[in-house]
């Protein structure tokens, strides 16, 4: 990638004096009438069907349009605004559905019995059968996105407020869309502005995350938490009294602007009426009623204490605003990222690199692909952490007892995380090919990584084989023993035990921390379990289990090692695609061939499907396999050992009567007692409100099977078939002007993996929803 030089004779000016170019590119709507305007070859129009595939492949590959880093940066920056506009429009749609087509008020009045719905099917060809009874006289489609629970946590009490939010989100969409146009056509930032790393860190940490978190804290303290306190009191059967008026329903709750009255809100949280003098006099304990550290969950809602959540956001705001001030920008004080990274030495044992991290700052600040790879890996990992917090630390009221929603949110965040991590590998591969300069990186950690790639990959390969043979071997053994009627020789909790002692020890550590002074500033320590899933007690809401201890046994240890196997294979494939992106013994000149290429020309047989893109392609399959095992395990484990109803004597009746420990230790058990037994709801859904999922289940299977046609067949077969058909058309003088051509190997694989993932996701979606919605 080239960097635009300054104009000849022009003296470099400080970036703060002139950070943008005015009227950089005039808005030209005629370009949109010419598909492929960004490429000379594509702009000529199609002469074969390959043109449409190349158009899709290159439309957003800004690197190849001009090859200028400044122009690419401007396009990406402008596209960010467009992305935000789409997000705001999507949010507006959600708010609008909540305002016009939902039973939000009915759910808010009785969240333990009324089911959430924000969509009603119109009776056109009989599909109104899908409008099931949600309770309180409302019929619609049950939603499992968790937005009702989230809105309740925000302090939203009516559809009127949702309509206001829908309108506001549309206004924001218009504003950011205008911002994208403005910052590309009217005031385009210069490359130096994009490369001001310290200023960017300050803007993100202080402005976006720090002040954003502080602003959200303000909303929680002044609006959401007082509203939730009133709603909690109503749900607990002990409504509060404000100014002599009993707050018996959500309609009685004061409006947000009324809660700014200190005398009124002081009746809910006295600390809010004490004034800011306590803040400046450091008497912060006066605020301890609305900024708490309770730990555990609210027994009324089964969710984290809203006052704990406010405290959390306030703490993050302080950390981020302080941390954002430590970087050196225009005043010449503070840390320089270049100096920090340049002074870091490599690991003397694993990667002895004399030049340490020298050159990494330049690489990251000149390669947006490298930055994106790091960010995607971090955010993807964060999404997976969020998935696990949905059930262990449920953040929103009544989320924990809405089992379909918990499963949906877990699955969603796992898949999003997996896709982002695969995206990280993709952009790391592109960065290595397009932005990595071998002459610059000499004996630094990047160089040492590439030189040690054979050792890294061979060790990963050994780990994968060890985990694969041993974990699957345990299952083979158990299936064989059960088939032969020798249950006493199986690995199980009742025969040969393989207890996860380390995990059980960690669980007991969390449980034993209750009452210890583990919290700074407290004398009593943790008043309750951080999360009741770690050897805690049963938290029941509305007669259903919200949280309880999750027991671990032999089945969990066996599946854990299956997870370890599949995740390590995914890591092996993705990492190999990055480390071997520029060259390999088979294809030494990969760097010249680019990120994606089908085959490496005549005379070099066996060199197809070795590009960095092909590794991402394979990694996507293994990512899907890995996460399918994770979400299936989660679904079955929770139904068997956690979710259920709490009886009057305190005992729990689980959804599937605890069959996980005995059935999940054989492959046959997974097929019979999970896939087959739990698919009964979706397979028998016709004629019920779940019939839509029955159709989706079949449709998802068809899309998935359709992908195999692209993945199992060779390009040559299709090209020969096309040529025969073209010959027949020529005979009849019906030949098209655009020549039909078979997909390239890369294009075929792209179509295949897309349908494979889409079909599998839709099938799983229908399977999970029908199962848990069918159980009620």
UniProtKB/Swiss-Prot annotation:
It comes from Prochlorococcus marinus (strain MIT 9313). This is Photosystem I P700 chlorophyll a apoprotein A1. GO terms for biological process: photosynthesis. It is an enzyme of class 1 (oxidoreductase). PSI electron transfer chain: 5 divinyl chlorophyll a, 1 divinyl chlorophyll a', 2 phylloquinones and 3 4Fe-4S clusters. PSI core antenna: 90 divinyl chlorophyll a, 22 carotenoids, 3 phospholipids and 1 galactolipid. P700 is a divinyl chlorophyll a/divinyl chlorophyll a' dimer, A0 is one or more chlorophyll divinyl a, A1 is one or both phylloquinones and FX is a shared 4Fe-4S iron-sulfur center. Its EC number is 1.97.1.12. InterPro entries: PSI_PsaA, PSI_PsaA/B, PSI_PsaA/B_CS, PSI_PsaA/B_sf. NCBIfam families: psaA.
């Amino acid at each position: 990638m080239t960097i635009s030089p300054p104009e000849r004779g022009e003296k470099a000016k400080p970036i703060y004096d002139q950070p943008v170019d005015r009227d950089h590119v005039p808005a030209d709507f005629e370009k949109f009438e010419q598909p492929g305007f960004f490429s000379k070859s594509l702009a000529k129009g199609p002469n074969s069907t390959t043109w449409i595939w190349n158009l899709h492949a290159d439309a957003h590959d800004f690197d190849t349009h001009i090859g200028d880093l400044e122009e690419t940066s401007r396009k990406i920056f402008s596209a960010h605004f467009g992305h935000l506009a789409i997000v705001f429009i999507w949010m507006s749609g959600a708010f609008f559905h909540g305002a016009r087509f939902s039973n939000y008020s009915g759910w808010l009045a009785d969240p333990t019995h009324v089911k959430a719905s924000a969509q009603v099917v119109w009776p056109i060809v009989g599909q109104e059968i899908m409008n099931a009874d949600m309770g309180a006289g409302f019929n619609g489609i049950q939603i499992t996105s968790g937005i009702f629970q989230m809105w309740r946590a925000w302090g939203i009490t009516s559809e009127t407020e949702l309509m206001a939010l829908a309108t506001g989100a549309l206004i924001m969409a218009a504003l950011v869309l205008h911002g994208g146009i403005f910052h590309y056509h009217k005031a385009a930032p210069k490359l130096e502005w994009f490369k001001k790393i310290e200023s960017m860190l300050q803007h993100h940490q202080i402005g976006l995350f720090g002040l954003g978190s502080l602003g959200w804290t303000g909303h929680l303290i002044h609006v959401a938490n007082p509203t939730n306190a009133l709603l909690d009191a109503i749900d607990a059967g002990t409504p509060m009294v404000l100014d002599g008026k009993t707050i018996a329903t959500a309609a009685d709750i004061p409006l947000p602007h009324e809660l700014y009255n200190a005398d009124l809100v002081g009746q809910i949280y006295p600390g809010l009426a004490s004034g800011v003098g306590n803040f400046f006099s450091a008497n912060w304990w006066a605020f301890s009623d609305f900024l708490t550290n309770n730990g555990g969950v609210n027994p009324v809602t089964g969710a984290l204490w809203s006052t704990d959540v406010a405290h959390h956001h306030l703490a993050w705001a302080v950390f981020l605003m302080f941390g954002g001030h430590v970087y050196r920008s225009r005043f010449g004080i503070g840390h320089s990222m270049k100096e920090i990274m340049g002074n870091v030495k490599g690991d003397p044992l694993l990667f002895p690199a004399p030049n340490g991290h020298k050159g990494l700052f330049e690489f990251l600040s000149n390669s947006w692909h490298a930055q994106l790879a790091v960010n995607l890996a971090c955010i993807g990992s964060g999404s997976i952490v969020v998935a696990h917090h949905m059930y262990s630390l449920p953040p929103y009221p009544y989320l924990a007892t809405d089992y379909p929603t918990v499963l949906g949110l877990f699955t969603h965040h796992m898949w999003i995380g997996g896709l982002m991590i695969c995206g990280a590998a993709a952009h790391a591969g592109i960065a290595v090919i397009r932005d990595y300069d071998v002459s610059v990186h000499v004996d630094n950690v990047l160089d040492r990584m590439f030189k040690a790639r054979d050792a890294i990959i061979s060790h990963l390969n050994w780990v994968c084989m060890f985990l694969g043979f041993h974990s699957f071997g345990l299952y083979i053994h158990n299936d064989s023993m059960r088939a032969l009627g020798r249950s006493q020789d199986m690995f199980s909790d009742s025969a040969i035990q393989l207890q996860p002692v380390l995990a059980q020890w960690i669980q007991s550590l969390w449980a034993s921390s209750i009452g210890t002074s583990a919290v700074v500033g407290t004398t009593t320590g943790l008043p309750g379990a951080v999360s009741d899933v770690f050897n805690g007690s049963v938290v029941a809401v509305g007669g259903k289990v919200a949280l309880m201890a999750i027991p671990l046994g032999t089945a969990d240890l066996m599946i854990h090692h299956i997870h370890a196997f599949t995740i390590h294979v995914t890591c092996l494939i993705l990492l190999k695609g990055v480390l071997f992106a520029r060259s390999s013994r088979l294809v030494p000149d990969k760097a010249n061939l680019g990120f994606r290429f089908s085959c490496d020309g005549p005379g070099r047989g066996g060199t197809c499907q070795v590009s960095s893109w092909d590794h991402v392609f394979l990694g996507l399959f293994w990512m899907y396999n890995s996460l399918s095992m994770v979400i299936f395990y989660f679904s079955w484990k929770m139904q068997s050992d956690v979710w259920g109803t709490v009886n009057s004597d305190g005992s729990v009746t689980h959804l599937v009567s605890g069959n996980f420990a005995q059935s999940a230790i054989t492959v046959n058990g997974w097929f019979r007692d999970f896939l087959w037994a739990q698919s009964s709801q979706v397979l028998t859904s016709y004629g019920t409100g779940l019939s839509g999922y029955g159709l989706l289940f079949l449709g998802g299977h068809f899309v998935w099977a359709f992908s195999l046609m692209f993945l199992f067949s060779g390009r040559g077969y299709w090209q020969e078939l096309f040529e025969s058909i073209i010959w027949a058309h020529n005979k009849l003088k019906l030949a098209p002007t655009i020549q039909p051509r078979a997909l390239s190997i890369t294009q075929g694989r792209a179509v295949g993996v897309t349908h494979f993932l889409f079909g599998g996701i839709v099938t799983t979606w229908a399977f999970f929803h029908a199962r848990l919605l069918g159980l009620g």
